[in-house]
Amino acid sequence: MCRIAGTPPRILPPLALMLLAALQQAPIKATCEDMLCKMGFPEDVHSAVVSRSVHGGQPLLNVRFQSCDENRKIYFGSSEPEDFRVGEDGVVYAERSFQLSAEPTEFVVSARDKETQEEWQMKVKLTPEPAFTGASEKDQKKIEDIIFPWQQYKDSSHLKRQKRDWVIPPINLPENSRGPFPQELVRIRSDRDKSLSLRYSVTGPGADQPPTGIFIINPISGQLSVTKPLDREQIASFHLRAHAVDVNGNQVENPIDIVINVIDMNDNRPEFLHQVWNGTVPEGSKPGTYVMTVTAIDADDPNAQNGMLRYRILSQAPSSPSPNMFTINNETGDIITVAAGLDREKVQQYTLIIQATDMEGNPTYGLSNTATAVITVTDVNDNPPEFTAMTFYGEVPENRVDVIVANLTVTDKDQPHTPAWNARYQMTGGDPTGQFTILTDPNSNDGLVTVVKPIDFETNRMFVLTVAAENQVPLAKGIQHPPQSTATVSITVIDVNESPYFVPNPKLVRQEEGLLAGSMLTTFTARDPDRYMQQTSLRYSKLSDPANWLKIDPVNGQITTTAVLDRESIYVQNNMYNATFLASDNGIPPMSGTGTLQIYLLDINDNAPQVNPKEATTCETLQPNAINITAVDPDIDPNAGPFAFELPDSPPSIKRNWTIVRISGDHAQLSLRIRFLEAGIYDVPIVITDSGNPHASSTSVLKVKVCQCDINGDCTDVDRIVGAGLGTGAIIAILLCIIILLILVLMFVVWMKRRDKERQAKQLLIDPEDDVRDNILKYDEEGGGEEDQDYDLSQLQQPDTVEPDAIKPVGIRRLDERPIHAEPQYPVRSAAPHPGDIGDFINEGLKAADNDPTAPPYDSLLVFDYEGSGSTAGSLSSLNSSSSGGEQDYDYLNDWGPRFKKLADMYGGGDD
C-alpha cells in the first residue's frame, strides 16, 4: 500500500485516499499502454513534503520503481544511510530523529539488480512542510475531542484497557487569524475521567518552551486553545505533547503527540534576489539564444499557489529594431532572444522590466513585484586592426636585451578591451635569427618591438622587419573585411665599447709539479671585439691566485711562477689549480673581462711514505695478535704503492724481537718474533719504500705498547684498571664506613630494648587511679625459683581468720596491693585438714609481706623466668585458704580499676 509522507494509512482523509488511488492507478495504466517495458525509476527527481520534525522509523514517502520482471530481485539503497533507509517495498524511512532545514533536503535513492548488478538512481527532495495544509475549517471542527489512545474492554470479571491502533491526525490552523483569542482548537480528554479527577497539560515549543504561551490548555476540561495569530513563515508546525495526571501528579495516561500545522496564506509578495540583473548577448545572435535567468522567491508555501510564481516582461527599452527582441520563460525566468537584428554598433544595451506574480500569475488575486534586467550586446570581431603608419623606426645599442626599440600603433573599431579588439602581432620577415619579439600593451593595444637576444654591431648594423596584426579571435564569418594589415619596422644598431674576452676561456695548462719560481709558464691574452672603434690597448692583471704562485705581464700577458708548484698543496683540488686574470681596455667607458687559467699539475715522486697509525698495542706473549699498519704517501700512482716494508738492521734488537710481513700493496703486519717480551713501550723503526722512479723511502717510528693480555687477547693493564677504578684507600674507607654503620645500628637496637624495659618498670609505679588504660598485663612470669630454701614447714598453718589490712599512707602503696578502702568481712571457710599446717605458714607470710613496705617484693623489675632444675615440693592442689569452700563477696575487685576488669568479671561477674 502506498503511503503519503508522514500520514499513517488508517487515518488518511478522503482527499488523500483519492490522491493515493490516482497514484496507484497511474503506473498501471502506463504499463498497459506501453508496448516496451523500461526498467528504472519513472522520474529523475521525486519531491515530497514532510513534517519539519522527523522521528526515527517514520515512513516518509514511497518511491516507485518499474520492474519488467517480477522474478528479479531489486535492492534499494540510500546515499545518506545515516539519515534515511529504503525498505524492500520502496518505502523511505527516517533512521533517526532530526529537524529538516528550511532548504529542501536532497539525497539519492538507488536500485540495484542482484544478478546483473545494473543500477538505477533517482534524486529525492524533501521539503519541510506538512503533507496536508488545505484542510478546511469544517474539517477542523470535526476534531472535537482527542482521547488518549486506550480503550476499555471487559475481561471475565473486571475491565481492562488496551492501546488503540490509531494515530492522532494533525490539527490544521490558518496563519494570520484575527481571533477572537484565545481561540479553541480541540479538547483533550482521557476515558478515565469518569472515575478519576484528572489534570491536563501540554508541553513542547509553543507551550512551555520558546516561544512560550502560544498554546494553552484548561487543566480541568482539557480544552486546547491558541492565544495569538500564527505566522507560517516563522514556524510552519508545532509538535506538542499532551499529559494527563491525577490530582496527586501521578501519570494516568501515556503522553500523546499533537501536531499543529500552520496553513499558509498569501501574505508575502515575491522578492527578486537582485533588483538589477545584468546579462550579455553577442550581436547578431540567432533567435532562441539564451541570455540570462532572473529569480524571485516567495516566503509563502512553494508547493501551494501562494508560492508558485510566474514571470513576464512588462517593457523593453529601446524598442529598436523590434519592441519584442526578448521573451522570458514564465516558470523558470530564463530570458532568450526571439528576434534577429542585434547590432552593437546601433544598440549597445537593452533594459527590460520583469514582473513576478504569485498565485501562478493570477493578475486578480496574485501579489507581484518587479525588477530590472540590463542586457548588454557584446561585440563580435567584424573589424580587423589596421596600422596607423606603413613604416616604424627604432634604434638599439648592441648587446642590450629586453629593450623596447619601437612602438607599433593600430586602430580597431570593435569594442575596446575585448577579444575582438585586442591585437596580436607577428613578424613575417627580416628576423631569421629570432633577435626580436613583439608584445602587446594591454592598455593601448600597441605592439612593443623588444630585443630578446644580444645584437653585435660588428655583425649586423640594421634590421628591417615586416610585421602583421590580427585580433585574438578570428573575424566573424559572413562579413566582408579588408585584407590583413602589415607594416615595416626599421631598426638601427648603435656601436658601444664592449668588454675584452680571453681566448680560450678557461685555458688549460699541464705542468709537472716542482716547477721553480721565476719559470715561464704560459701566455694568456684577450681580444677586443670593437673592430670599428678607435684602436684601444689592453692591460692585464691578476684577479685571483689562492697560493700566490703566479704573476702576469701587464702588456703581453706572459705568466711566470713566483713559487714552487706543489701538487700536494691544499689549494690544489683533483690535481687542478685555478687562477683568474683580468684584461682591461682604455675605451670610454673602460671595459674589462676575466679569464680563468687552469693548471693541471703532474705528480713527481717528491714525498716519501709514512707509517699509519703512529701508535699500537700488542700482548707481551707470542699470540696471533699482529699489528696492522698502513703506508701513507701523498703522491699518486705510479709514485705511491705498492710499498716495501722492512725492519732496519740497527739496532739488532729490532729484528731479534720483531718481524714484519707485507699483506698487500699498502698494508703490512708487525708481530713479535720471540715468545715473551716484557711489558713496556717500544719504538719500532720501519723502513717503507714506494714504487716511484726513482724510489723514495723513509724510516717511520711506530710506538708499540706491550702489555699483559687475557685469554681473549685483550690488554689487561693493571695500571689502566686501577686508574679507571677505585684505589685501595678508597676501598678501605668504604669498608670502614660500612662497619661503623653496622655498629650504630646495633647500638640503636640495644638502646631501644633497654628503653622498653625501663618503660615496663615505670608502669608498675604509676597510680592506677591516674593511669587508666585498657591494657592487658602479663602476670604469668614467676621468676627462676625460690631463693630461700631453708624454711619451716610447721609454720605453714592456715589461719582461722584474715585480718583486714591496715590503711597505709598515700604514696607508699604497692601497685599489686588491693585498693585502700574498708573491706567487707566474709565468713571464714572451713579449712580442710592438711598435714604440717602449710596454709597457716603461707597466710602469715602473706600478711607480713603486705603490711611491711620494706619486705620483698620491692618496686623493681624482677626476673621470674627461671624455675630451677626441679621442685622438691609436692602438689599444691590440696592447699586451702581460710575462705575455701565458702561464698565470698568479690565486688571489691571492681574498685581496682580497668586493669583488673577481666579478673572482676571472672569472680564477681554473677552467673557468668
From Swiss-Prot:
Quick one: signal sequence residues? 1-28
Q: What InterPro entries does the entry give?
A: Cadherin, Cadherin-like_dom, Cadherin-like_sf, Cadherin_CS, Cadherin_pro_dom, Cadherin_Y-type_LIR, Catenin-bd_sf
Extracellular compartment residues: 165-729
This molecule's function is given as: Calcium-dependent cell adhesion protein; preferentially mediates homotypic cell-cell adhesion. Cadherins may thus contribute to the sorting of heterogeneous cell types, and thereby play an important role during embryonic development. Required for proper neurite branching, and pre- and postsynaptic organization.
Q: Where are the compositionally biased (Low complexity) regions?
A: 869-886
Annotated Cadherin domain residues: 165-272, 273-387, 388-502, 503-609, 610-720
Designated name of the protein: Cadherin-2
Identify the tissues in which this protein is expressed: Expressed at intercalated disks in the heart (at protein level).
UniProt lists the gene as CDH2
A GO biological process of this protein is: synapse organization
Kindly list the places in or outside the cell where this protein is found, as annotated in its UniProt entry.
Cell membrane; Cell membrane, Sarcolemma; Cell junction; Cell surface
What GO molecular functions are on record for this protein?
alpha-catenin binding; beta-catenin binding; cadherin binding; calcium ion binding; extracellular matrix binding; gamma-catenin binding; identical protein binding; protein kinase binding
Provide the residues annotated with a glycan attachment (glycosylation): N278, N330, N407, N578, N628, N657
Which stretches does the entry tag as region Disordered?
Answer: 869-890
Q: Which Pfam families match?
A: CADH_Y-type_LIR, Cadherin, Cadherin_pro
Residues holding Ca(2+) 1: E175, D231, E233, D267
Q: Which residues form the propeptide?
A: 29-164
What residues bind Ca(2+) 3, as annotated?
Answer: N266, N268, D298, N306, D358
Could you list this entry's UniProt keywords, alphabetically sorted: Calcium, Cell adhesion, Cell junction, Cell membrane, Cleavage on pair of basic residues, Glycoprotein, Membrane, Metal-binding, Repeat, Signal, Transmembrane, Transmembrane helix
- Chain ranges on the Cytoplasmic side, renumbered to this chain: 753-912
